[in-house]
Amino acid sequence: MPAWVLGSLRGYRRSWWRRDLVAGLTVWAVLIPESLAYASIAGVSPVVGLYAAIPALLLYPVIGSSRHLVVGPMSATAALSAGVVGGIVSNDSGDFPAYTAGLALAVGTLAVLAGLLRLGFLANFISEPVLKGFIVGMALVIIVGQLPKLLGIEGGDGDFFQKLWAVVASLGDVSGWSALVGLGCLALVLVLRRTAPLVPGSLVAVALGIMLAAVLDLEDRGVEVVGHIDAGLPAPGVPDLTAASDIPLLLSGAAGVMLVGFAEGLGAAKTYARRDGYRIDADRELAGLGAANLGAGLLDGMVVNGSLSKTAVNAGAGARSQVSGWTVAALTVLTLLVLTPLFASLPEPALAAVVIAAVIELVDIGGLRRLYDVNTAALTTIYGRAARADFICALGALLGVLFFDTLPGLLIGVVLSVVLLLARTAHPHVAVLGRVAGGAGQWVDVERDPGSSPVSGVVVVRVESGLYFANADAVQDRLLELATADGVRALVLDAATVPSVDVTAAGMLRDVAAELDARGVRLLAVGDVGQVRDVLRRTGAGAVLDRLYPTVEAAVAATSPGEGEAAGDGAARR
């Protein structure tokens, strides 16, 4: 058996089982109502969330590397699922549940393949600011989408703003009983979260809603209920898709869903691995996510991924291994076998309240404000509008979700982050350095430390970026501008801060050296990085290395009248 199979359970101790059992029971109390709620976000019957949770909890530990991660339906991927499937078949179509399960299979297939190909680094392409903006936008869309159920009114179609306007326009038709149940359950969950965080508020709200439905006969009073749910487990099988031509559409949407789910789950797994001193294998996490989704799809479920909130509950309750996850799976099976008749009378407003309570804390306006405040006047001077790249990316993803739906919003954020990264690296800061008085050879940016002193006739510069084709011209223009000013006899380039160089940039350095030589200005370099040295030599720009010095002080000293270039020849060659 491969070493990675059940790797998260290796070293299991018998003394752990009590903690794992208690943690599993605690997570079950949170997972049941949230899975019901997230299934409604995905546009399918609430019980589909339970169908998906069971194989996810059973299969992830077989491959995954986290001892604590809880895998199941989540709000972000549920919203993405609704968007992807809704773009293929109508929300009212009888095929919607099958396509939802088909999307889980597509996500699982892609994730397993990506894990086998060791593509775990893909999560790095969704930056934290993009994910922040996406999640805030998604949470707002979910909340507005649940308001009609919460208040017992007709909802609207379209983007976030069209749905919001439909809610506002229908406020005169609010159902009193629906609003009372929905708002009451919402208030209950939020109050319990603040005053009694150990109490599973969502489960309490669901139980209260079921009790009120029975005692007050809410269905006869016009309150919508979940309705009949078949008891037991569905038979495993491949979803019946009506058209094979829809499979490419599912696969294309599955790529974005997989990335979001993987990024969210990987972050949760790493958080608790750091706390307990073990390592997470990103490729195994991808494959584990894939196995969980394949199982969910084959059991008529929906897309699943790792949950930070439920993982926190799991770890906080003392879980030591994935035995806690298997405990949750067993309890969920028991729930489907015995308790499903109770969920039939669950009021839709109570379920909407659980959904809203679950996502309302994701509307992190303070986090967006912190991204905005990261910018400084100095950064604005250097990068212009691109100085607020993180905030712009988050805002782009947020607005993209609100105007164009979830997956397009995510893509907008990713594209913006790449464009702004290129914009910043295409015009890197070329700092002019000055000597710090009494600093024992310390050189700093004169713009940031006015007390530093430039050397007369010598310009010392530091390029704060790697050099490549996109910024070669900008750096060349800046170097020549500084080196050809009146009275300059030498340009010292601190190359220790240049981590990489490509062929285009190497040619640029060769051209700069030649032009400065023709003008009688010496070009000297300080320090180097091995890969930079190799590229310069292999591209014919090795002459720059013949003027290489170990320190800025040594290079500046070599520019003094009477000092020859030979003073630096080979001084820093390695």
Features from the language model and the residues they span:
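Transmembrane helical cores of multi-pass ion-transport proteins
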Residues: 1-440, 447, 455, 471, ...
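Structured cytosolic domains appended to multi-pass membrane proteins
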Residues: 433-574
